[in-house]
Amino acid sequence: MGAAKKINYKKVLRDLVPINALSEAHIDEVTRKTTFEDLRSGRYVFRKGDRDYQSVYLLEGTIELIGAAREVVGTVKAGSEDALHPLAQKQPRQLSARASGKVTVARIDSRLLDVLLTWDESAGYDVVEIDAHDDDDWMTRMLQS
């Protein structure tokens, strides 16, 4: 596994699903904790059966998805609609992913993403306390009339 070049991928990450649903502060945190990796042609990004708890995104190049019989069952090209989503997300991995030429991938801890998404969702809820003994509520006024 090679070290990725030093490029700020924050703009690229903010377009990826589900990162695009995070708050700006959480996108910053994901960007800091993401591992960017360059791989040569023929190297595996992950293999069928792996349980790595990572969301892996293709940022540059083309990935071949390899099935159980070692046949290519699909390809994903950087910049495509499929590349906006994590590669073969289900754990354990149902497919292998192999670089078809030089590629750059982003590896993000799936558990971190889950926590940040939950925090952002719960931050969107407002809890309103209802006082059942409030004489000014509309139902009480209506019943008293």
Language-model features: locations:
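Cyclic nucleotide-binding regulatory domains
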Residues: P18, R43-K102, L113, H133, ...
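A small-molecule sensor/coupling module
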Residues: Y9, H26-E29, L87, P92-L95, ...
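Short proline/glycine- and basic residue-enriched helix-capping loop/turn segments at helix->loop/beta transitions
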Residues: P18-S41, P92
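Hydrophobic residues at beta-strand termini and immediately following loops
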Residues: E37-L39, V76, I108
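Short, flexible segments with low predicted structural confidence
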Residues: M1-A3, I27-D28, T34, A69
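A short, N-terminal "cap"/entry segment at the start of jelly-roll beta-barrel domains
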Residues: M1-K11, D15-A25, R141-S145
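Residue-level signal for pocket-adjacent positions within structured domains
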Residues: N8, R14-V17, T34, R40, ...
